[in-house]
Amino acid sequence: MTATAPVKTEYEAVIGLETHVQLGTATKIFSNASTEFGADPNTHIDPVVLGLPGTLPVLNQKVLEYAVKAGLALNCQIAPYSKFDRKQYFYPDLPKNYQISQYDLPIAEHGWIEIEVAEKGKEPYTKKIGVTRLHMEEDAGKLVHAGSDRLAGSTHSLVDYNRAGVALAEIVSEPDLRTGKEAAEYAQELRRIMRYLGVSDGNMAEGSLRCDVNISIRPKGTEKFGTKVEIKNMNSFNAIQRAIEFEIERQIRCLETGEPIVQETRLWDEGKQVTKSMRSKEGSSDYRYFPEPDLGPIEVSETQRETWRSELPELPAQKRHRYAEQYGLSAYDARVLTDEKSTADYYEATVAAGADAKQAANWLMGDIAAYVNANKLLVSDLPLQPQDLAELVNLIEAGTISGKIAKEILPELLEKGGSPKAIVEAKGLTQISDPAQIEALVDELLAAHPTELEQFRAGKTKLQGFFVGQLMKKTGGRVDPKLSNQILNQKLKG
């Protein structure tokens, strides 16, 4: 669906995200049932999860710690006093027919994060996005509808309660986002922060991070919000961006044609790349919230809060800034290297072992990244240790080997690890950098190709590439490129 350019310039989107982050605790939020992903259906359940008579929930203290740390990392104010509430709704994936959540007294609120947005053909910019609140709640079970992707049209439904009771942190943003690109970047930055903290793996494919989008359209320059639509079922950051871009076009078309925009929940159809109406949107009054009577209030002392704050790691934005300042890296390089904490840790260990910061970055973002991505690994999984990568970089810097030789031995290092210096010595790959030795090799080469030499001196200068190639072939790429080019130039010109 495509709108004309003038129409696009008349409206702006107002976008907020509700992000559910599964907290990586070993047991569930209110019971000792396991949270392991991928187990047989209905094997990680217990009487508390199923809401059987006589059972009482007990708050997992690790969940509270993770929620507070996440709130602190999002620059939120941590509530010294908060509570749990019952959110009532009747659906088969909720065995108790209510969800234990937090309503009017969340554990954290009034925060923000800063995102960096780089769109093709546009100047990159940073933007501060408000975080309205972060609250704790339990996850629901999972429904599988036979014969359809939703309840309507299915012949029957199966329910798996393994996910029920898994701890969630729901993070609600302010409606500060304006484009699909901004929303996708916000979601990615949230995931980076959660992974750096170690409170969640943020795996969207496994449902560890799920985003719902709230979006409305209004004429530019006005403050009044349009009719809000919620979008669900986006399982990647690209899907978030595409769903928003489609929905912006759809809502603009509605306004232009006089068709009413309905307040509803819509599903993103990945196959057709469209949003589809799912149901009318409930208001908070539909859930009949009231305080959870089986759980006491949550109190976080100043001492406890500051103890948890002191345990926070350096976060992605802080690392990006430091890499630019300390290592002189570009914003792009700093962003790539800090995307995964394991990559950042590996990079810093490589530099600490003596490697040049820029050269180490180039290797990690180039050949090593290609290998890691192709094999679906993390850098930390590699047999090649940071100190060995530093040794490889230093061998090149010292002129012991060429970059070409380094690339030739890299596959072995990535697969088996070991000392680059030892491999170079064992295979006789040390770079030839003695001028007298190179001069002798060049003399032999020119003597072996008199015809080409004559043609070169007659004006066919493109043949210089032929001689360079032959010299590299003759030495197995071991000859010092810069020095050999100088000597070859001198000899060719007679």
UniProtKB/Swiss-Prot annotation:
SUPFAM superfamilies: GatB/YqeY motif, Glutamine synthetase/guanido kinase. GO terms for biological process: glutaminyl-tRNAGln biosynthesis via transamidation; translation. GO terms for molecular function: asparaginyl-tRNA synthase (glutamine-hydrolyzing) activity; ATP binding; glutaminyl-tRNA synthase (glutamine-hydrolyzing) activity. The keyword Nucleotidyltransferase does not apply. It holds the Pfam family GatB_N. Keywords: ATP-binding, Ligase, Nucleotide-binding, Protein biosynthesis. The keyword Protein biosynthesis applies. Transmembrane segments: none annotated. Its EC number is 6.3.5.-. It catalyses: L-glutamyl-tRNA(Gln) + L-glutamine + ATP + H2O = L-glutaminyl-tRNA(Gln) + L-glutamate + ADP + phosphate + H(+); L-aspartyl-tRNA(Asn) + L-glutamine + ATP + H2O = L-asparaginyl-tRNA(Asn) + L-glutamate + ADP + phosphate + 2 H(+). Belongs to the GatB/GatE family. GatB subfamily. Heterotrimer of A, B and C subunits. Allows the formation of correctly charged Asn-tRNA(Asn) or Gln-tRNA(Gln) through the transamidation of misacylated Asp-tRNA(Asn) or Glu-tRNA(Gln) in organisms which lack either or both of asparaginyl-tRNA or glutaminyl-tRNA synthetases. The reaction takes place in the presence of glutamine and ATP through an activated phospho-Asp-tRNA(Asn) or phospho-Glu-tRNA(Gln). This is Aspartyl/glutamyl-tRNA(Asn/Gln) amidotransferase subunit B. It comes from Synechococcus elongatus (strain ATCC 33912 / PCC 7942 / FACHB-805). The lineage of its organism: Bacteria, Bacillati, Cyanobacteriota, Cyanophyceae, Synechococcales. The gene is gatB.
